[in-house]
Curated annotation (Swiss-Prot):
Residues 46-84, 133-143 have a biased composition (Acidic residues). This is Ribosome biogenesis protein erb1. The keyword Cell cycle does not apply. WD repeats lie at residues 428-467, 471-511, 613-651, 654-699, 703-744, 760-790. Disulfide bonds: none annotated. SUPFAM superfamilies: WD40 repeat-like (SSF50978). One of its GO terms (molecular function) is ribonucleoprotein complex binding. Residues 321-337 have a biased composition (Pro residues). One of its GO terms (cellular component) is preribosome, large subunit precursor. Its main location: nucleus. Residues 1-12 have a biased composition (Basic residues).
Length: 790
């Protein structure tokens, strides 16, 4: 480049330049650190200028083009002699490397506008004059208005005699603004511009107007809003001191020794006091004064000086103590102890002998308001009368062993035989086994389960003899054998229907007799005239017995009774011609919930036209073993109806929340003195009722942890046994003997707990039945098995 361009004027630095500061050779240049290092931004220059405190401002162009020309302008008369080495080192830099760096700088600054202009100084050299910095939002410079008054804190009164009021940032005078006339002020007050305040700015002398930001701030303050944007007044509270009480030591320092070692200083002080007492300098007891000294001239007599202590009389009885005061004797008793106006009036009108207490409780509020007790002298006088006039008697305490008050029960070993172990397990049902029944001969066992099948097993061996599927969807809820050995008829309830079947596994003679009993009803049903149109239109007409389908008929099913509602209970009459069914569903009408079926006539009757009052829907029903009485149990009570007279005989109140089942003693009203029955409930209680004693239970037994599903007496009365089945997976065997003596009660003894069924789906043992001649019982469980207990 030519010398004219290279002769740029720079102001010299007032301090010496270090020799090695910022000088690198071309070989030492590391291109990895050049990212962002070359820049011609004015902000970089301004930051460098601010950091220098002891330097004269350098006004220069730091572009790559000027850096290339700096070598020629560093004369020896402009900078200290130490800078010559710096110029030499710069001249040793390779021209190619420096030119490449300058080319990169020029290319990077071509698209940006220069922030300076070149002028001539007094010597004719180029002078670079930079534009004024316009700070942005991120700059540290404050935005100063163009005509702002920069006089600072000088009062404006100093400029009253001058035509100007101050100076701007460039040092120019700010002239005093012209004042308007009164008409102009009136017009300004009428046409109020935006931001008008009516005040005068003391720094400029012009009317003070508010900016848009200030108006917005005033609006937020007036509307009770948050002035600052982005401020959240509902930030979560930082609990510097937590509100929860922390019970812990503030430090983990060990306990100091002075806490558990006697103090030496206190020991010294105590020893000083002890030494002073021994020397007589400190008297532990205050000597009596002259006033306290006794007067020897006064003669004193002791009335009991010669009185010898007399022993109590052998029959001496100490005086009884007064009872401690109660809440009603307090001067501020609780409100429930204060009498009402009615009680107070009744107490005042009653005779003193008839009053429950001799005073009325009063509330005085505080102890200082309590007056004197008017009956105090009277009570003390009566107390004295009681002490020396009333005879005293010693009461001897009865030393009775509580065990002797309990009835002596016989040992279970003396009450054998009863079932104690599992002998046979019956497996074959899919799902829960809901019901079972042992036939009158004691050879066969019928079961029904959730799979909709009825199975007949050989009792002793557990071999399945016969099976029929009655329903594809509904379970078999109950199966019962017809009483009597002359025929073998099985009744089963599955879904809405009752099925009567004769299993083809018995002798031909018994099978023929059973079929004859069932076929006799078809002839009677055919002879009955058809119902009239009025009777046919009734809602709850008795169902007609039907013949089964061909597939069921081939398997031994002989008749079907469509009840239209699900039956959960079925019980036969002792003669085998009647059986009663109960539909306990809540949607079942009350008039059809209980039905009595006649086997010889194929006839179904509904004895109840209305719902039984109290206790909810019916749950179970049984015939009396020797009387024409029907027992019907709902959720809370058991009612006995005389079928011959059609009257309600008795209502039993077991006190259970929900009755699950009940059974009548087989020898009721024959060998025993009255009727006895047992009741099982879902609230884990087993209740024994003696109808001759009371409507309430005679005994309540609570031995199970879960609901009781079934209870059963041993049939025939040969063995005084009964059992219950519970959801806890166990059976309880009891001894229950009754006698014909009206003065003696039933004897109930718990004998054995039988466990073997698994609890499945919160259900355990669902049904239980006894062998007709042996002390054996059979149980059905929710685990899909049946067990024979011997």
């Amino acid at each position: 480049m030519n010398g004219s361009k290279a002769s740029k004027k720079r102001k010299a630095v007032t301090r010496d330049v270090e020799e090695e500061a910022g000088v690198f050779s071309g070989d030492e240049l590391n291109t990895d650190n050049l990212d962002g290092a070359l820049s011609d931004n004015a902000n970089d220059l301004s930051s460098d200028e601010d950091e220098s405190d002891s330097e004269v401002e350098l006004i220069d162009d730091f572009s790559d083009e000027d850096d290339e020309e700096e070598e020629d302008v560093l004369d020896s008369d402009e900078i200290p002699s130490d800078g010559e080495d710096l110029a030499k080192k710069k001249s040793n830099t390779a021209p190619g490397e420096l030119g490449a760096a300058m080319d990169d700088g020029e290319s990077s600054s071509e698209g940006e506008q220069l922030n300076y202009r070149i002028e001539k100084d007094a010597n004719g050299n180029d002078r670079f004059v930079y534009d004024e910095i316009n700070p942005d939002d991120n700059s540290e410079y404050s935005d100063i208005e163009e005509n702002a008054n920069t006089i600072g804190d000088i009062p404006l009164s100093f400029y009253d005699q001058y035509p100007h009021i101050g100076y701007d940032i460039n040092g120019k005078k700010i002239l005093r603004p012209a004042k308007g006339e009164a008409l102009d002020a009136l017009l300004d007050s009428i046409e109020i511009p935006k931001g008008w305040t009516g005040l005068t700015d003391p720094s400029t002398g012009k009317p003070l107007e508010l900016s848009q930001e200030e108006l917005e701030l005033l609006r937020k303050v007036q509307m009770n809003e948050i002035p600052e944007d982005g401020y959240n007044p509902y930030e979560p509270t930082v609990e510097w001191f937590t509100s929860q009480q922390e019970i812990m030591p503030l430090s983990a320092a060990p306990e100091p020794k002075r806490r558990f070692v006697p103090s030496k200083h206190e020991a010294k002080r105590v020893m000083k006091i002890v030494k002073a007492i021994r020397e007589g300098r400190i008297l532990p007891f205050k000597p009596p004064t002259e006033e306290d000294e006794e007067d020897d001239t006064i003669i004193k007599y002791d009335l009991w000086a010669d009185e010898a202590e007399r022993k109590d009389h052998p029959m001496h009885i100490p005086a009884p103590k007064l009872p401690p005061p109660g809440y009603e004797e307090s001067y501020h008793p609780p409100p429930e102890y204060l009498p009402s106006q009615k009680e107070r009036k009744a107490w005042e009108e009653a005779d003193p002998e008839d009053r429950a207490s001799e005073f009325l409780p009063n509330d005085f509020g505080s102890l200082r308001r309590v007056p004197g007790y008017e009956n105090f002298v009277k009570e003390k006088f009566e107390r004295c009368l009681d002490l020396y006039l009333a005879p005293r008697v010693r009461r001897s305490k009865l030393n009775i062993d509580p065990e002797s008050l309990l009835p002596k029960l016989p040992s279970p070993e003396e009450l054998k035989p009863f079932p104690t172990a599992c002998a046979t397990v019956f497996r074959g049902h899919k799902g829960r086994v809901r019901t079972l029944a042992v036939d009158p001969s004691g050879l066969l066992l019928a079961t029904g389960g959730d799979d909709g099948t009825v199975r007949v097993w050989e009792l002793l061996t557990g071999r399945q003899l016969w099976s029929v599927k009655l329903s594809e969807e509904d379970p078999v809820n109950v199966v019962r054998w017809r009483p009597g050995k002359d025929a073998l008829i099985l009744a089963a309830a599955a879904g809405d229907d009752i099925f009567l079947a004769v299993p083809p596994i018995v002798d031909p003679a018994i099978e023929k007799a059973s079929l004859d009993i069932l076929d006799a009803g078809w002839g009677y049903a055919a002879s009955v005239p058809p119902p009239t149109p009025a009777e046919a239109n009734k809602k709850n007409n008795p169902p007609k017995w039907m013949r089964p389908s061909s597939s069921l008929a081939d398997l031994g099913v002989c008749a079907v009774i469509p009840l239209r509602y699900v039956a959960k209970s079925l019980s036969w009459h002792r003669r085998g011609d009647y059986f009663v069914t109960v539909c306990p569903g809540s949607s079942t009408p009350a008039s059809v919930a209980i039905a009595i079926h006649t086997l010889s006539k194929h006839l179904t009757q509904y004895p109840f036209r209305r719902r039984i009052k109290g206790g909810g829907p019916p749950q179970a029903a049984h015939f009396h073993p020797s009387k024409p009485i029907l027992f019907v149990a709902n959720q809370r009570s058991i009612r006995a109806y005389d079928l011959s007279r059609q009257l309600l005989v008795k209502i039993l109140q077991p006190g259970a929340r929900w009755i699950s089942s009940f059974d009548i003693h087989p020898t009721s009203s024959t060998a025993s003195g009255g009727d006895n029955l047992i009741v099982g409930s879902y609230d884990r209680r087993l209740l024994w009722h003696d109808l001759e004693l009371s409507q309430r239970p005679y005994k309540t037994l609570r031995y199970h942890r879960k609901a009781i599903r079934a209870v059963k007496f041993h049939p025939g009365g040969r063995y005084p046994l009964f059992a219950d089945a519970s959801d806890d997976g166990s059976l309880q065997i009891f001894h229950g003997s009754v006698t014909g003596d009206m003065l003696s009660n039933a004897t109930i003894v718990p004998l054995k707990v039988l466990k073997g069924h698994k609890i499945t789906g919160e259900l355990g043992v669902l049904d239980v039945d006894w062998h007709p001649r042996e002390p054996w019982c059979v149980s059905a469980g929710a685990d899909g098995t049946c067990r024979l207990w011997m």
